[in-house]
């Protein structure tokens, strides 16, 4: 029986707002509520995985399936990414051989440059799976994918998926080794991606730079603070730098907190979807404020306190409650100073 091809994953704010705590490998599942940053409009919607047909629940079965010549091989890549993400023992995540096989397959698929939808989905989900590992065997091919030329209207984007996977991989590596991705080629590729005009790619790259860290990444994030043409990239830069304690982000965070309408929406977005996006933006901004206060106790947040006081009267109950918590925290810190 033929399988219906699901709508390709999209990116939203927060999930694009990958969260005030650095997002972990599972942040892709939530897209835009990603704990730690603000990844607006930039995350794969993993909810589609819940209904995708399963091709076997073990890694080897799925690897053989995607290495074969059958149709819908991308489903095997989805299954592998799902298995890796749910691997609580770490056995799969630490499997260098498995990572190497997936990396080799992605390299082959990039070289073949097939244009069919199945081939495109396979490349995207292979890249996604490689980000779930706790070993960096897939990093070189992710860099290759980021540097690959693709049609501007190609969706889902392999380049964006690869950038996103570098972010997740960096978060994973930092968790298990204490060090994020520092490979110069990877950092350079993500920085170049942050200069692209495509909003999703640029926004995703800004998020990834926050996960990578390092002086070169931070320098680029500071430039993106003035990227008014791409608000979500700008917000991701601000939330990343907030976690580093940079007071220069205060004005951008204040702007984020006073968002009435999401700056980047689609004509297809319903009113409810826009309200939800606005809530994710504001709550992510609130998390970033707390991160800044924690990282830099001496930062002048008086202008933020004024904004928070207004948010305690917001029509959204969730925003009101969260703003009250953050306001009390800042006022307490100020009193103790």
Where are these regions (language model features)?
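N-terminal intrinsically disordered, acidic low-complexity segments at the extreme N-terminus
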Residues: 1-20
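N-terminal Sec-pathway targeting helices
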Residues: 22-38
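Structural detector for internal amphipathic alpha-helices that build alpha-solenoid repeat scaffolds
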Residues: 31-34, 46-54, 73-91, 118-135, ...
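Alpha-helical transmembrane segments
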Residues: 39-46
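Amphipathic alpha-helical scaffolding segments comprising HEAT/armadillo-like alpha-solenoid repeats
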Residues: 52-64, 88-113, 135-149, 172-194, ...
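Short extracytoplasmic/periplasmic juxtamembrane "stem" segments immediately C-terminal to an N-terminal membrane anchor
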Residues: 59-78
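Short coil turns that connect the paired helices of HEAT/ARM alpha-solenoid repeats
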Residues: 66-71, 104, 108-121, 148-155, ...
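Hydrophilic extracytoplasmic domains
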Residues: 302-337
